[in-house]
């Protein structure tokens, strides 16, 4: 928990991606606490400070939904903003629709999705813009259900550099350089071997037709070069009654890292607006 919440403001809970990506990158949003609201982040079960492995039966949406509910109860939080990035946004959508919990001032759906099928389709569309060699390596790996080849690894790395994030260097923020205990098992059994082949427990995730059940205002944020393509983001925007969409030009899957100033400004203005300030 970073900072304290001033009277008239609500804290913000951050849900990281993956599953299994850890909270580390969210430390880039510590500065949000300077405006007088606590920023709450945690490592979901299966990674970081909550690392567990050898229990593939755990890696279901229900596990992480129950964990989020337990966190909110434990901290006695009765009003808050909820930000989910990538998989974390999927978890936020599940929470908002299945729990219909009171006290959520707003939700921020950052580079996320309402349908695994649409997500996979869009990733495959973008793969077609890659070199023929990379396309062939990915297609062969998927056809054989074998993602162990060096050619596939290189192709997947190229894809992620294009649409997820750049390489971490000595000049990157410390929270990105810091060694993390990623949840490889949680990712594999929860999502799949990569971003475009959902084979895990989230493979049939689809809340597109239920987005209208979300009763809180939602800010959709994504990048033009994002894994969360404009079509994926627009599907969220179109389906949620009270929604706004901010598109970061030139950003990949983590606009809060690549365009931190703009991201924090948009985020803070949104939360203040929803608190009636």
Language-model segments: residues:
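Conserved loop-alpha-helix segment in the C-terminal half of the alpha/beta-hydrolase fold
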Residues: 201, 208-251
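Conserved hydrolase catalytic core segment
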Residues: 78-122
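Conserved HGGG/HGGXW glycine-rich cap/lid loop of the alpha/beta-hydrolase fold
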Residues: 1-53
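Catalytic active-site module of serine/aspartate enzymes centered on a nucleophile-bearing elbow/loop
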Residues: 242-277
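Conserved catalytic-core motifs of eukaryotic protein kinase domains, centered on the activation segment
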Residues: 24-26, 50-56, 119-121, 231-232
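Flexible "cap/lid" loop of the alpha/beta hydrolase fold
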Residues: 105-146
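Alpha/beta-hydrolase
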Residues: 129, 136-216
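Active-site loop/oxyanion-hole signature of alpha/beta-hydrolase fold enzymes
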Residues: 44-87, 91
């Amino acid at each position: 928990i970073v900072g304290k919440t001033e009277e008239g403001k609500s804290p913000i809970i951050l849900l990281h991606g993956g599953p299994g990506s850890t909270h580390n990158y969210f430390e880039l949003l510590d500065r949000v606490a300077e405006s007088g609201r606590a920023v709450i982040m945690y490592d979901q079960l299966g990674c970081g400070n909550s690392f567990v492995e050898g229990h593939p039966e755990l890696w279901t949406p229900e596990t992480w939904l129950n964990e989020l509910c337990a966190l909110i109860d434990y901290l006695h939080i009765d009003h808050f903003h909820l930000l989910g990035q990538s998989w974390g946004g999927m978890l936020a959508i599940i929470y908002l629709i299945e729990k219909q919990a009171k006290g959520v001032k707003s939700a921020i759906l950052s580079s996320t999705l309402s349908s695994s099928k649409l997500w996979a389709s869009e990733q495959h569309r973008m793969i077609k813009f890659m070199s023929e060699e990379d396309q062939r390596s990915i297609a062969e790996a998927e056809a054989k259900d074998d993602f162990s080849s060096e050619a596939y690894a290189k192709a997947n790395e190229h894809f992620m550099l294009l649409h997820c994030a750049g390489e971490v260097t000595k000049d990157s923020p410390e929270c990105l350089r810091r060694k993390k205990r990623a949840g490889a098992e949680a990712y594999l059994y929860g999502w799949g071997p990569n971003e475009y082949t959902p084979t895990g427990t989230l493979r049939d995730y689809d809340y597109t037709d239920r987005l209208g059940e979300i009763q809180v205002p939602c800010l959709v944020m994504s990048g033009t070069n994002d894994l969360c393509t404009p079509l994926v983001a627009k599907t969220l925007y179109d389906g949620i009654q009270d929604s706004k969409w901010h598109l970061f030009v030139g950003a990949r899957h983590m606009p809060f890292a690549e365009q931190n100033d703009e991201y924090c400004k948009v985020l803070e203005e949104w939360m203040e607006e929803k608190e009636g300030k």
